[in-house]
Each structure stands twice: as C-alpha cells, then as structure tokens.
Curated annotation (Swiss-Prot):
Subcellular localization, as worded in the UniProt entry: Cell inner membrane
rRNA-binding in keyword set: no
Pfam family, one: Glycos_transf_4
GO molecular function, one term: UDP-N-acetylmuramoyl-L-alanyl-D-glutamyl-meso-2,6-diaminopimelyl-D-alanyl-D-alanine:undecaprenyl-phosphate transferase activity
Membrane topology qualifier: Multi-pass membrane protein
GO terms classed as biological process: cell division; cell wall organization; peptidoglycan biosynthetic process; regulation of cell shape
Name of the molecule in the record: Phospho-N-acetylmuramoyl-pentapeptide-transferase
Length: 378
C-alpha cells in the first residue's frame, strides 16, 4: 500500500490540511473512475483469461511504479533546488507555489515509456518498432522541455529557450518522426474517421504530421498551469485512446501505460502540488498523444479528445490578436480574457483551482466518452 507523501514543510499543517484533503479526494475520484473504466473494458473484451493482454494490469503497474519512484525523486529535486519560478504577472495566489520542485517529467515520462516498451515485448512476443519510434519522439520533446526548464532555473527568471529555437527543435523532432512513419507504413498518409470515412491525404499529410506534435506539445504546455490539471486531463485522454485502439495492441499498451504514469505523477502533483511536471513533462505528454494519434491514423479522435487543450491554446492566440487589434495611440490594447490561458481567466473570475481542475476533468471525460461512442456507433 502506498503511503501518503509528506506534507510540504513550507506550510503549517493546520493551514494546508483542508486543501490537501480536497485535492486528495479529487485524485481518488479520478483514479477510481479510470480504474472502473479499464476493468469494464477488459471484462467486456474478455481479456482476463490472458492478464498480459488486459489494460488494467499495465495501467496499475505503471501507476504504482511512478508513484513509488516519485517518493524518492521529489525529495531529490527539492534538495537540488529545482524550485519553480512563478511568473510575476500571473495570479497572485500562485506566488505561494514559488520554490515547488519542477522537472517532474524526468521520472514519470521515461518510466512509462520503458514499461510500455517492455510490456509490448512480453505481451506480443516481440518489441514494437512503432512504440520505439514514438518513445524517441517523446524523449526528444522531453529533452527540449528539460533544456527550457534548466534555462529558467539557471537564469532564475521565466525566460527559458527562445520561442523560435524551441519551435525549430520541436519541428525537427516531428519531421524525423514523420519521415520514419511514412517510410515504414505505406498507409500512413491515410486518415480514418468515424463511420468508415477515409481521407487519403497524400503529400498533405507531411506538413500535418509535423504540425500535430508541435501543436499538441505546446497545447499541453499551456494547460499545465494549475495543480494536477495537465496530469489528470492527460491521463483521461490517453486512456480514451487506449480504449478505442483495439486494432493496434502495441499502441493500446503505450496509451494505457502512459495514462497510469500520469496518474502516478498526479499522486505527487494533485492540489496542493509537491512537484510540477515542468516543460519536461508537458511537452512529452503532448508528443505521446500526437505520436499515438498519427501512428494509428486516428487524428480525428485525437482532435476530439484534445479539444480542451486546443481551446487553451486558442485562448492565448485570441488574447494576443485581440490585444494587438485594439491597441490605441498609447500603445495599450484591450484584453479579451482576464488572463490567458483560459484556466487563468476562470481563476481571476473567482473560481478555485480545484473547481477549475474538476470542471476540466469533466470536460475531457465527456470528450473521451464522445470518442468512444463514435467508435462504437461506427
């Protein structure tokens, strides 16, 4: 049985206990809900006769492994002084998060990828080159995120890598993955949709395949602004993909293992967070969603289940464009939202972190249910 991680020393127990209990209740609700979904799927698919073929077992192993590993890594990150630098123009309530260890992606991302690679090997009798290629894409994005996190910590400011350099590196990784995908799978340029619709994109697939990991990675990066938000929504989205990808058992395992890894990380990241995933984790999380969607030809389903992430991205784009469009002679424009991304708009409107996170979990769960229903109706 996993022990509850120690309470942060920077707060008194009396002040933090109510928030801790509320955050833990939400975490438990999410964990139980996802567990019920995996058990129901395996029961309906009659997988229990072959435990290695179930979704429940790898999901649980991944969750437990990451949660236990975090008990050693989180204190180490704190000793290494990897404390998060909080943006000065952000919500004032976030200033109390300053000093919380970041770069949490370094322990849940490689653990999930390694377990998925090994599990597919044991379950199918051979290692999956597709899982290996996606793992390389994810590690590339994690490395970009780690470099960005490191620059922020080294400079003690929110200025990490330049946007141009970061996008260039992301584009290189996405292009290499796209090249491998097209070379290894002659049907890679064909995108499927519900009700049997098939879209042969031809050469148009290449720019799309490069864009998707970049868009998904940065969307998750923007979503990672509240305790447990990116980790929880990522766990739901990945499990959704795992459920609908029965024709691709290796990608199914990758999706559910990474979902379990997200939940294991959430054990330490739920409100009030004891560690943040940083760009190391958020960029990697977007990359694994994109890689699975591209390799399985399920870009339509990826778009649906990632709807919240893209709304977060669009809120930032809309805020910038509106500000520029309304700029007056004094050089000051108007804001469309109180603050972008969207979760900060709600936060400044008086919503608590837990209310926002709980609501966003529900939105992604509904989008996931829509994906499953569309797959079933097809």
């Amino acid at each position: 049985m996993l022990e509850r991680p120690p309470m942060p020393s920077t707060k008194t127990t009396a002040a933090i206990e109510p928030r801790w209990r509320a955050g833990q209740r939400l975490f438990r609700l999410l964990a139980i809900g996802l567990l019920i979904v995996t058990i129901a799927y395996d029961t309906g698919a009659n997988h229990w006769q072959q435990p290695l073929q179930t979704l429940t077992l790898p999901w649980l192993v991944s969750f437990a492994l990451v949660a236990v590993l975090g008990m050693a890594v989180v204190p180490l990150l704190r000793r290494l002084k990897t404390g998060q630098i909080i943006r000065e123009d952000g919500p004032q309530s976030h200033l109390q998060k300053s000093g919380t260890p970041t770069m949490g992606g370094i322990f849940f991302v490689p653990t999930g990828l390694g377990l998925a690679f090994l599990w597919t090997g044991f379950a199918q009798g051979k290692l999956s080159p597709t899982v290996g290629a996606i793992a390389l894409l994810v590690l590339w994005y994690a490395a970009i995120g780690w470099w960005d996190d490191w620059q922020v910590l080294r400079r003690q400011s929110n200025k990490g890598l330049s946007a141009r350099l970061r996008l260039l590196l992301e584009g290189i990784g996405a292009a290499l993955f796209c090249a491998w995908l097209v070379a290894s799978d002659p049907t890679a340029t064909v995108v499927t949709a519900p009700w049997g619709w098939v879209w042969p994109l031809g050469m148009a697939f290449i720019p799309l395949a490069i864009f998707v990991p970049m868009a998904e990675g940065n969307a998750l990066n923007l979503t990672d602004g509240l305790d447990g938000l990116a980790g929880g929504t990522g766990a739901i989205a990945l499990l959704t993909l795992g459920i609908i990808l029965s024709p691709y058992p290796d990608l199914q395992i990758l999706a559910v293992v990474m979902s379990g890894a997200c939940l294991g990380f959430l054990w330490h990241n739920h409100h009030p967070a004891r560690v943040f995933m940083g760009d190391t984790g958020s960029l990697a999380l977007g990359a694994v969603l994109a890689g699975i969607g591209l390799a399985s030809h399920h870009l339509w389903e990826l778009l649906i289940v990632s709807g919240l992430f893209f709304v977060e991205s669009l809120s930032v784009i809309a805020q910038v464009l509106y500000y520029k469009a309304t700029k007056g002679p004094d050089g000051v424009g108007k804001r469309l939202l109180r603050m972008a991304p969207l979760h900060h708009h709600f936060e400044l409107g008086g919503w608590s972190e837990l209310r926002i996170v709980r609501t966003f979990y529900g939105v992604v769960a509904l989008l996931g249910l829509l994906c499953v229903l569309l797959q079933w109706l097809a």
